[in-house]
């Protein structure tokens, strides 16, 4: 049996057989903290902000499992390195009375596109911990082993020239293609929310060169 449906004309039930199985397309479960913590504890722990659809609560998946469907043993989330938070804020869920399940991610900036650019990234101790030119997922998961599971991105006044030189591909190319005005708006918005800071003085050291 592939599916049992109910007619809208006379309410009788119809059975459709599926010899090769059923592929169910019903969305994911990023809007359900219970399922997120149970099925993807690592991905959940390194997430600072999420732009999911609130309706993605995994109800279709739960119904399918109840009916006997197989569920992947490991979750396969696509995490982007663009959810930014203020200093001192850890990655992972925080309590939220207004959110479904009473939990939400702390960040309100979910798509800071320049975050994907391979600028220097350091943990809370000022230590570089990963290859900044790695794909979206890699730098985020590398942060799982750092204090608070977060990091800081450091750039200078040559940011736009550097972005052009990096010439990243995929959706991260938006920062390069959109130009100076777009980049400035992104930085200004982050600064207003306490997530982006302009340095007044810079000091060099042997450690920075290393």
Residues of each region from the PLM?
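Predominant activation on well-ordered alpha-helical scaffold segments within soluble catalytic domains
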Residues: 58-65, 155, 184, 205
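Glycine-rich loop(s) and the adjacent beta-strand/alpha-helix scaffold that form part
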Residues: 16-89
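Glycine-rich loop/linker segments at domain edges
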Residues: 143-202
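Conserved beta-strand-loop-beta-strand element in the redox core of flavoprotein oxidoreductases
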Residues: 1-15
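Short, glycine-/Ser/Thr-/acidic-enriched flexible segments
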Residues: 8-10, 21, 28-30, 125-128, ...
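Rossmann-like dinucleotide-binding core of oxidoreductases
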Residues: 50, 61-153
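Conserved small/polar residues in nucleotide/adenosyl-binding loops
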Residues: 203-209
